[in-house]
Amino acid sequence: MGNNLLSAKATLPVYDLNNLAPRIVHLGFGAFHRAHQGVYADILATEHFSDWGYYEVNLIGGEQQIADLQQQDNLYTVAEMSADVWTARVVGVVKKALHVQIDGLETVLAAMCEPQIAIVSLTITEKGYFHSPATGQLMLDHPMVAADVQNPHQPKTATGVIVEALARRKAAGLPAFTVMSCDNMPENGHVMRDVVTSYAQAVDVKLAQWIEDNVTFPSTMVDRIVPAVTEDTLAKIEQLTGVRDPAGVACEPFRQWVIEDNFVAGRPEWEKAGAELVSDVLPYEEMKLRMLNGSHSFLAYLGYLAGYQHINDCMEDEHYRYAAYGLMLQEQAPTLKVQGVDLQDYANRLIARYSNPALRHRTWQIAMDGSQKLPQRMLDSVRWHLAHDSKFDLLALGVAGWMRYVGGVDEQGNPIEISDPLLPVIQKAVQSSAEGKARVQSLLAIKAIFGDDLPDNSLFTARVTETYLSLLAHGAKATVAKYSVK
């Protein structure tokens, strides 16, 4: 073992690691999964004698994460950060860590075809589904998806790997597994089902029918702020525990998981670790996506433009704090259907979480992949307001902030490094238009983001144009101050 994590000054696994059975294959061993689903499984094993263990898999990228985990007996550290206290736990629920580039595709597929595998879960980010954010449909013409359809036995996408594993289980007479998305998308289970069945129909119609008959795709809502791991993060974890852990991750103390209780081959008793098992996740998903993620994106674009590197920096500016609070309660909350939740209290708790100085959640990180995030975080709410003839000035400002950000130059004239799967389309829209009103019209014409309806809505285009021109003329700080409400 490269690092003796079992000697760390942390909460250590008290369960026998050998008694865990690998029942879940997880695709996407990133920071969020380690700090969220991994912790729930660790709590169940520690406090409730659960024997549900994980096979962790990375398909594209993240080779070093898997290699680091393999070097330390599949153990890793999760540090919870509040303003004045850091605590750490060593998570031991991983039975094996695999990467296609290290271990080979056949090894990954063989793991997914072990008879006891009951669930395949995913955290691959929105862009990993290769679906259109505006329509939710699988992009069969995307080069990676098209390549998998042509060569389905050697897939590279997560969808292709899942369908090939299910095809092999069907051929071997093995039962299907549940496929559970844990990514930030509304009705992520429906998105997962639609991309899997669309892909399967393109490959094998009989297999597609078997999947529809035998596989479930529960929706989930996941919540925990997990900043990207930095060298500073790892140094603090080492200072806290006395052990260097390159697979370590740090997060806030808060965590939430709402799960649609729809599994074909059993599941862990996640409720014993604090998860909520419900029949309909959508109201919770919409609450989180619009109030938390929507305000996060708002702060990310407008904060970055103002020179704020971290979300907690934004919270120290009272105008940004008031604007985020107003966005949550005045423009997002009215669109929600969730019952039995005090939304004002929820908003207050979000502001407190954003203000945590230990997190240092970078605005640039949250600003990534905006084309995949705007529809569910802001644009669905805009459509609600247009239908109800109500104000959406802050939502319009958030959209304008994204447009100003993807223009690629900040208010000091410095280049912005844009990370987005639609970057070529966005850059074409920017480069083919003059700055100002024409830029807004050019970006609104991207149908994969704004659909057919919003670009043709004169009220929406007017509001976005008005706020965009204000950002150009007065800058982000002054514009946010103008629209914030105390």
Swiss-Prot record:
Keywords: NAD, Oxidoreductase. Its EC number is 1.-.-.-. It is an enzyme of class 1 (oxidoreductase). One of its GO terms (molecular function) is oxidoreductase activity, acting on the CH-OH group of donors, NAD or NADP as acceptor. The gene is ydfI. It holds the Pfam family Mannitol_dh_C. The lineage of its organism: Bacteria, Pseudomonadati, Pseudomonadota, Gammaproteobacteria, Enterobacterales. One of its GO terms (biological process) is mannitol metabolic process. This is Uncharacterized oxidoreductase YdfI. Belongs to the mannitol dehydrogenase family. UxuB subfamily. NAD(+) binds at I24, V25, H26, L27, G28, F29, G30, A31, F32, H33, R34, A35.
